[in-house]
Amino acid sequence: IQSLDRIPEENLDEIVSDMSLEQSATYLKNHYKINKQEERIISEVLNFISDFYEYEVNLMPGFKEFISHYDSINVIGTSCDEELVKIALNRLAVLNYFEDIITCSKVNKSKNDPDFYLACAQVLKQRPEDIVVFEDADYCIDVARKVGFKVIKIKDWRDLNEKCINDCGK
């Protein structure tokens, strides 16, 4: 946005964090009056964030230790680009722990839409009440709980213990 001589909103990250890339591009185009096609905006956004995913993004503390102890089917539900997520997970040596990556773009729903979580349940072939969602964003926690998922709020994976898992965030 700054490269277009526009001042980004202070909370722009929060605004677009639950949107698909397509939704983000439309928002940016309309809100900042950008005279480019959405496809071009998406391309520029991906170029901007790809280095971060490829070289800088890290796991939350304790995540690798946590996931290595559980033999369950795991999927990632994310608003990020699937290829960028795969690059990061591969670099961090945890890609093999996941069966699938469900993106907002793949299901054409944002993470603030209950259908996003229901699509993840379909991939897992499980009912929402039989799935535990680990989430760090409050708005996502509320949406997932509303459609019957058990949710555990995560800020640091080292904080998880057996009681937390058994309670499933109730």
Describe the residue ranges of each PLM region.
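Helix-loop "lid/cap" segments that line or gate small-molecule binding pockets
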Residues: I1, S20-N35, A88, C120-A121
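Conserved SAM-binding loop
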Residues: E14, N74-G77, V133-F134
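Asp-based, Mg2+/Mn2+-dependent phosphohydrolase catalytic module
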Residues: K64, S68, D81-E82, K86-K170
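Short beta->alpha linker loops
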Residues: V16-S20, E44, N58-G62, C80, ...
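Metal-dependent phosphoesterase signature
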Residues: I7-E9, Y27-K64
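A short, Lys/Arg-enriched amphipathic alpha-helix followed by its capping loop at the start of a domain
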Residues: S3, E65-S72
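Short glycine/serine/threonine/alanine-rich loop segments
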Residues: R6, I34, S72, Q126, ...
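Active-site neighborhood of HAD-like aspartate-dependent phosphohydrolases
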Residues: I1-E14, K146-V147
